[in-house]
UniProtKB/Swiss-Prot annotation:
Organismal lineage: Bacteria, Bacillati, Bacillota, Clostridia, Eubacteriales
Limits of the MGS-like domain: 1-144
GO MF, one annotated term: IMP cyclohydrolase activity
Protein's recorded name: Bifunctional purine biosynthesis protein PurH
Family named by the database record: Belongs to the PurH family.
Gene: purH
Length: 501
């Protein structure tokens, strides 16, 4: 009995060459619908699926291969005499190669289509054949990825058959794909029904292996969401090396922080912590303000902009060593300047941050929560003195920055510049002291969480702070309010805390 391959693909890249190879090895080809037509038109001797099933395609193509004469030929164990006896009695031909790729649900779910239109891209027959072939991998070679055509061709050419090791690997790739595919469908179907479903299905596809993880002894890779075109899976690298694991984490924060602002803004960042944040009339002014606050820490840092980078800004940035620059666009002459630094990673972003959920792994579990996308609940002035309009602008600026600083976090600022940033401390007074020490001339103070005691207010008064913004909610809020009134400081509550761990 001749060996037989069943080919049914949406993505036809490379399939004609692969089919020609199979025919050259005396392997029969059975195919369906558009694939059958494509192969036939290109001179391939191919059997249409309904010649095997004696049953026509139906329901607008929804039912083509869902038939015992197909699946028995895939699932029969060749060394099982009873299985082979059944095939012989019912004149069922074995299927030795299953070549299937799926309807592009991953791509279509992100497009501007109706719910019903997206549902039509949920593949049924393809996954069923793939799973059947993968289960019976000892007897069937299953190909779900066009990149594996060459692997199979080489083994048949060199050894006359596909090795069991390769068959098992290909089968594993099928179940890996199906897990992601089914997960994407589940998330799509439950999107408006359950915020936190009983089973968490995450669907990500590998973008690339990374040189190493957070440290050189840790292996790492980066994966792209199949459901969302976010900022970090759609950017272009215009210059420099591939991003490292730490680069990915840092760029994410720098880009998010810069995009908190409506006006032109720049966020300079090191080790996932902002070291300079400022707004200005343009990217140049914002960068220079951020740089001048801390010209030491910015060395080797990541720079995020929310506006196009011009030549003048580029000329300033290449004066120091930087790891990455992230911006929505670059003037051509700016790009020429930046490319003089061959190792400087220059990224062009196409999407603003849009994450709605964030996940963190702990040992044996995963934590899922809403992304911290809200800044304030409402502004409530709680002191005798009210902040001026200028102070209120700076208070909101400070709260936008403090969101991105490790808790406990304090930011002091003036005129759209984060002059002092203190964070990552186990009490609130230490980051206050750090921020004030660095932030000479600051007039406002922003805190990521409430004040358990009045000590922060007292320190702020010593440092010349005129207005404070914090969430409120402490049992001792009144002590802090009284302290502000004593010092003539305005204070507002926002109702929202911004812990970052």
């Amino acid at each position: 009995m001749k060996k037989r391959a069943l080919i049914s693909v949406f993505n036809k890249d490379g399939v004609l060459d692969f089919a020609e190879f199979l025919v050259s090895k005396d392997i029969e080809i059975v195919s369906t619908g558009g694939t059958y037509k494509y192969l036939k038109e290109n001179g391939i001797d191919v059997i249409e699926i309904n010649e095997v099933t004696n049953f026509p395609e139906m329901l607008d193509g929804r039912v083509k291969t869902l038939h015992p004469l197909v699946h028995a030929g895939i699932l029969a164990i060749r060394d099982n005499k009873e299985h082979m006896k059944v095939l012989e009695e019912r004149e069922i031909h074995t299927i030795d190669y299953v070549v299937v790729n799926l309807y592009p649900f991953f791509e279509k779910v992100k497009e501007d289509l109706t719910f019903e239109e997206k549902v039509e891209f949920i593949d049924i027959g393809g996954p069923t054949m793939l799973r059947a072939a993968a289960k019976n991998f000892q007897d069937v070679t299953v190909i779900s990825n066009i990149n594996d055509y060459e692997v199979v061709k080489n083994e048949i050419e060199n050894a006359g058959q596909v090795s069991l090791k390769t068959k098992k690997k290909l089968a594993g790739k099928v179940f890996n794909l199906m897990s992601a595919y089914d997960g994407a469908i589940a998330n799509f179907m439950l999107a408006d029904e359950e915020e936190y479903p009983e089973y968490l299905s995450v669907s990500y596809k590998k973008m690339q292996n990374l040189r190493y993880g957070e440290n050189s002894h840790q292996s790492a890779a980066v994966y792209s969401s199949t459901m969302v075109d976010g900022a970090m899976n759609t950017f272009e690298t215009l210059n420099g090396k591939e991003l490292s694991y730490n680069n990915f984490k840092d760029v994410d924060i720098a880009w998010k922080c810069a995009n908190e602002f409506d006006e032109p803004a720049c966020c300079a960042l090191k080790h996932n912590t902002p070291c300079g944040v400022a707004t200005g009339e343009n990217s140049y002014e914002a960068y220079m303000k951020a740089y001048e606050v801390d010209p030491t820490s910015i060395f080797g840092g990541i720079i995020g902009f929310n506006r196009k980078v011009d030549k003048k800004t580029a000329q300033e940035m290449v004066k120091i060593f930087l790891e990455v620059i992230a911006a929505p666009d670059y003037d051509e002459d700016a790009l020429e300047v930046l490319k003089t630094k061959k190792n400087l990673r220059v990224l062009k972003f196409h999407n603003t941050p849009k994450a709605e959920k964030c996940m963190v792994t702990v040992d044996g579990a995963i934590l899922v929560q809403d992304e911290d996308n809200k800044l304030i609940d409402e502004i409530k002035v709680v002191t005798e003195k009210k902040p001026s309009d200028e102070e209120m602008e700076d208070l909101l600026f400070g709260m936008k920055v403090v969101k991105y600083v490790k808790s406990n976090a304090i930011v002091v600022a003036h005129n759209g510049i984060a002059l002092g940033i203190g964070g990552g401390q186990v009490n609130r007074i230490w980051p206050t002291e750090d921020a004030l020490r660095r932030g000479k001339g600051a007039t406002i103070l922003a805190s990521d969480a409430f004040f358990p005691f009045r000590d922060v207010v007292d320190k702020a008064a010593e440092g010349g702070i005129k207005a404070i913004i914090q969430p409120g909610g402490s049992m001792r809020d009144q002590e802090s309010i009284d302290a502000c009134n004593e010092h003539g400081i305005a204070m507002v509550f926002t109702g929202f805390r911004h812990f970052k761990h």
